[in-house]
């Protein structure tokens, strides 16, 4: 090994996000609400959302959610600034899996949250646009996929449930 991190909290398995959060020219490794420097040492640990659900590890992501030109970490029910401070949070929502996309044409993107078998669409400040909507067929749900599934020029939200894959329109309906 070139390096090995210390033990991270709340990690079962997961997929790290890689981004240069602090603009030092070196990428950081984002795992849930924890950020490692590129040498494996801990840069910061957030105090809230973790982007995980059930017995599944974190799948956080990096996006400029508030359009300030700086990367933000989206982790479950929380958006962190690049320095680890909380930018937006909705404690009434569970932790879960996220995706970020612009669904309504406004400058700020929206945040999809999949957790506990339900789907929410959130504004960039973590207020609820719609949801919760149960995933047909049951199951906890996995990481959402954003794509134009039906070729109408608008993004939809794809989510795997226990027994089927479901595509939600941007208003939360399923065709």
Model features per residue range: what roles?
Residues 1-175:
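Extracytoplasmic/lumenal domain signature
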